[in-house]
Amino acid sequence: MMKILISNDDGVNAIGIVALTRSLSQIAETLTVGPDRNCSGASNSLTLTNPLRLNTLDNGFISVSGTPTDCVHLAIRELYQDEPDMVVSGINAGANMGDDTLYSGTVAAAMEGRFLGFPAIAISLVGHEHYETAAHYALKIVKALQDNPVAQDKILNINVPDLPLSEVKGMKITRLGARHRAEGMVRTQDPAGKEIFWLGPPGDEQDASDGTDFHAVANGYVSITPLTVDLTAFEQLKALDNWLANISEK
C-alpha cells in the first residue's frame, strides 16, 4: 500500500484535512501532519527562531507549532522511518488560483514535498461547503498519479468548484490566471482605542480568460495547473542581455 503524507495550511483540525485524510485512507497509509493553528498566507516560510513542538491528537493527526512547510519538512525528515510515496496538501477552504499561489501555505506544503523529491499535489475547494466533492477528486487524481506520475520537479495545483459532485462538468488542464491588486487595508481600533490594520480582500480576477484556472472553475470544471519553482522569466533573458550591454557601453 502506498504511503501518503497529508498536510495543509488551515490547521490540523480543519474540515478539509479531515475530509482529505478520510478519502485517501481508502487507498493509502496516511500520516496527517498540520500546523496547530490557521496558517493561511504563510507561503513557503520556515520557523527559524523557535523550536518546533509536536502533539499527537486523539484521531492520530499530529499538530506542529510551525508553518505548513515546517510540517512537511519535519514529517519527512523525522517522523517517517521509510519515505512517503506522495505529499498531498489540502483541502484548502477557498481558492488558490492565479496570484494566490504565491501566498498560499497549501501550495507551499506541496512545494516542500517536491523540494524533498516526492510527487506532490495541492488541492483547494473554491468555497466552504462541498468538501466531499474535493475529496472525491483528490482520490481520483492520486489514483491516476500512481499509474502515471508527473515529473518530480513539478506539482499539480488543483482547484475544485464548490458544487455537488453531480454538477461538476469534469477536469481541465489550465494555466494560472491573474488578479487585480488587492483592495486597501482595513483601518480600525482595538478595544484600547489603538489603531490597527487588517489586510483587505484579494483583488478580483484580471485574467480569467479561456485556459485559466479561474475560467475553468467558473464554468464548473476542476482546474489542474502544473507549477514549478523556477521563477526565471526566460522570455526576458535576451532583452535583458541587450539592456545590460547598453549600460556597459555608457
Curated annotation (Swiss-Prot):
Binds 1 divalent metal cation per subunit. Transmembrane segments: none annotated. A divalent metal cation binds at residues 9-10, 40, 92. Its cofactor is a divalent metal cation. It is found in: Cytoplasm. Nucleotidase that shows phosphatase activity on nucleoside 5'-monophosphates. This is 5'-nucleotidase SurE. It comes from Shewanella pealeana (strain ATCC 700345 / ANG-SQ1).
